[in-house]
A protein has these predicted regions:
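Short acidic-aromatic low-complexity motifs
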Residues: 129-139
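Juxtamembrane loop-helix boundary motifs flanking transmembrane segments in multi-pass membrane proteins
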Residues: 14-29, 117, 121, 156
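A hydrophobic, helix-centered structural microdomain
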Residues: 22-94, 208, 213-229
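Hydrophobic structural segments characteristic of membrane proteins
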Residues: 1-17, 65, 137-229
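Transmembrane helix boundary and interhelical loop/hinge segments in multi-pass membrane proteins
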Residues: 62-63, 120-122
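Short, glycine-rich, amphipathic interfacial segments at transmembrane boundaries or analogous
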Residues: 6-7, 67-120, 179-197
Length: 229
C-alpha cells in the first residue's frame, strides 16, 4: 500500500464507523434472515450434490476425504473452520510449501498473487467442481452457523494476514462471504492487491442493494464459467 492509498484509508475511517461499526439494525436483520433462508435451501441441495461428488471420485479413483476443512479469518479476526468440497490432491499443502521453500516458479507465483494459475494439484473432479463453483456449496453450512454470509469479503487465510497491511483492520469488521466483490470482478483473474482493495471498498460502502447486485452478478459469472474463485 503506497502513501497516498494509506492516507485515503485513514480518511475513510469515519465513513467506516458509520457504515460498518454502527451498522443499521435493519440491514443486519434482513441480511441475516436472507442468509438463514438461503443456507437452508443450499444445504438441502448439498445432499444430492455430495452423492454425485462421491460417485465421481469413485470412478476417477480420487481417494481421500470428500470435504476439505480449513481455518480462515472471520469477523473481528476470529478463526473459523470453512468447508469446501476437496478439489486438490490430499498432500496439496505439503506440495505448496515445498514449492515456496525451493523458490520454484509455482512458489514465486503463489507468494506474489496468493494463487496459482493452472494449479497442478487440482484433481480431475476438482476442475469440474471449481469450474461450476460447486466446490463452494458446503459453505452454506458456514452461512447457517453464522461464520459467513452470502455476500462479504473473501475468507482470507491466516498466512495472508502479513500481506494485507492496513486493509486487514477494515476487512475483518465484516463476515466473510460465500461470494463478494472479488468474485464478480473477474473472480480469480485479479491479483491480491486488487482483491484487498475491492473487499475494502465493499466493507466501507456495503448495502442491501449492493449485496443483491453482487448475488446476481455471481450467478451470471457461474453460468459464464469465468475464472474459478
Amino acid at each position: 500500500m503506497d502513501g497516498n492509498t494509506y492516507e485515503r484509508v485513514k480518511e475513510d475511517y469515519d465513513k467506516l464507523k458509520d457504515n460498518v461499526v454502527a451498522e443499521k439494525k435493519m440491514y443486519k436483520f434482513v441480511k441475516r434472515t436472507v442468509d438463514i433462508i438461503a443456507s437452508i435451501f443450499g444445504i438441502i441441495l448439498l445432499v444430492p450434490i455430495t452423492i454425485i461428488v462421491c460417485i465421481l471420485n469413485f470412478f476417477t479413483q480420487n481417494k481421500g476425504p470428500i470435504f476439505f476443512v480449513q481455518e480462515r479469518i472471520g469477523k473481528d479476526g476470529n478463526l473459523f473452520k470453512m468447508y469446501k468440497f476437496r478439489t486438490m490432491v490430499i498432500n496439496a499443502e505439503e506440495i505448496l510449501n515445498r514449492h515456496i521453500e525451493e523458490k520454484t516458479d509455482i512458489g514465486k507465483e503463489y507468494i506474489k498473487n496468493k494463487k496459482i494459475s493452472n494449479d497442478p494439484r487440482i484433481t480431475k473432479v476438482g476442475k469440474f467442481l471449481r469450474r461450476t463453483s460447486l466446490d463452494e456449496f458446503p459453505q452454506f453450512i458456514n452461512v447457517l452457523k453464522g461464520d459467513m454470509s452470502l455476500v462479504g469479503p473473501r475468507p482470507y487465510l491466516l498466512r495472508e494476514v502479513k500481506d494485507m497491511n492496513e486493509y486487514y483492520y477494515y476487512i475483518v469488521k465484516d463476515k466473510p462471504g460465500l461470494t463478494g466483490p472479488c468474485q464478480v470482478a473477474g473472480r480469480s483473474n485479479i491479483d491480491f492487491e486488487e482483491r484487498l482493495e475491492l473487499d475494502y471498498k465493499y466493507v466501507i460502502n456495503k448495502s442491501l442493494k449492493k449485496d443483491f447486485i453482487i448475488l446476481m452478478k455471481t450467478i451470471a459469472a457461474v453460468f459464464k464459467k469465468e475464472g474459478a474463485i
